[in-house]
């Protein structure tokens, strides 16, 4: 069922909280892989199916009619994020005139339904649990941080300084190669403004940033 309101979406997300991947997959008649080595997107696909997401692999939000993006957040036993969170691919060409306000990153992060999931590898995939959903919109300070990082990183792209980009740049968001392997290439802008072959780059939220979102949610629950 495709949720028609935010309330319906949240209700559906709350209804699967506490289930294991195996329980939910059996309900939906979806086979469970032994691990995620060859099926990295399996958990996201499972939750998209359970919640009625509509975007598939398109660039729009997962629940575009509600303006909501779905993000899984693997956490460890202490409740800390285990990995960075992919947001979107960076526009390496045809990016003149792109501003933060009309960027894919801002669009994707304007409203997110976070689904924390058990991610510790010693727990068999079937037995990992789904956590309580978190509806999140960036605070003014978070938006400022995201905008600052995006502008700094996009400046390097537009000015042809791809070779200067490292994962260390960015307070809350970083740029990293995004591709199944190092042979994946795309077009980018070189030092002299020429078009070059380069690795696709993706914007990723740092673990410290998503931990902040989790902690803020837990604080409201403990009040």
Curated annotation (Swiss-Prot):
MF (Gene Ontology): DNA binding; endonuclease activity
One Pfam family hit: MutH
SMART domains: MutH
Nuclease listed as a keyword: yes
Signal peptide: none
UniProt GO BP: DNA modification; mismatch repair
Subcellular location: Cytoplasm
Chief place where the protein resides: cytoplasm
One GO CC term on file: cytoplasm
InterPro entries linked: DNA_mismatch_repair_MutH, DNA_rep_MutH/RE_typeII_Sau3AI, DNA_rep_MutH/T2_RE_sf, Restrct_endonuc-II-like
Protein's UniProt keywords contain DNA repair: yes
Record's keyword terms, sorted: Cytoplasm, DNA damage, DNA repair, Endonuclease, Hydrolase, Nuclease
Family named by the database record: Belongs to the MutH family.
Record function comment: Sequence-specific endonuclease that cleaves unmethylated GATC sequences. It is involved in DNA mismatch repair.
The protein's name: DNA mismatch repair protein MutH
């Amino acid at each position: 069922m495709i949720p028609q309101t935010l309330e319906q979406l949240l209700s559906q997300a709350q209804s699967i909280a506490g289930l294991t991947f195996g329980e939910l997959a059996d309900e939906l008649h979806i086979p469970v892989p032994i691990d995620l080595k060859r099926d990295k997107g399996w958990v996201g696909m499972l939750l998209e199916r359970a919640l009625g997401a509509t975007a598939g692999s398109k660039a729009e939000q997962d629940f575009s009619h509600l303006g909501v993006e779905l993000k899984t957040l693997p956490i460890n036993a202490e409740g800390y994020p285990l990995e960075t969170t992919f947001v979107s691919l960076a526009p390496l060409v045809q990016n003149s005139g792109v501003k933060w306000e009309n960027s894919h990153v801002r669009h994707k992060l304007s409203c997110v339904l976070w689904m924390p999931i058990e991610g510790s590898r010693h727990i068999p995939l079937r037995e990992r649990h789904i956590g309580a959903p978190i509806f999140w919109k960036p605070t003014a300070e978070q938006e400022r941080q995201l905008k600052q990082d995006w502008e700094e990183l996009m400046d390097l792209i537009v000015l042809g300084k791809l070779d200067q980009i490292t994962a260390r740049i960015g307070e809350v968001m970083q740029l990293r190669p995004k591709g199944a392997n190092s042979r994946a290439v795309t077009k980018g802008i070189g030092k002299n403004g020429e078009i070059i072959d380069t690795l696709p780059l993706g914007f990723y939220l740092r673990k410290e940033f998503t931990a902040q979102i989790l902690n803020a949610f837990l604080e409201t629950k403990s009040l």
